């Protein structure tokens, strides 16, 4: 998953406004950071997406993106 695909998946799953809020504000305990901070720290977009889906109860959206 590329960074651009991460953000496309966020918007497709949560919508533009809520998706941006989740990425910047929702603390993902398993990563010890928000999604934005985890990505900036070098965590793979795929791992961040998996944790975001789990934290928000949207495991059904886990595979909305393509696999490399």
Q: What function would you assign to each model-found segment?
A:
Residues 1-68:
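C-terminal alpha-helical interaction appendages
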């Amino acid at each position: 998953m590329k960074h651009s695909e991460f953000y496309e998946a966020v918007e497709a799953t949560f919508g533009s406004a809520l998706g941006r809020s989740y990425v910047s504000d929702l603390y993902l305990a398993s990563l010890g950071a928000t999604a934005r901070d985890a990505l900036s720290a070098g965590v793979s977009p795929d791992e961040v997406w998996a944790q975001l889906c789990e934290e928000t109860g949207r495991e059904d959206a886990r595979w909305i993106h393509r696999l490399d």
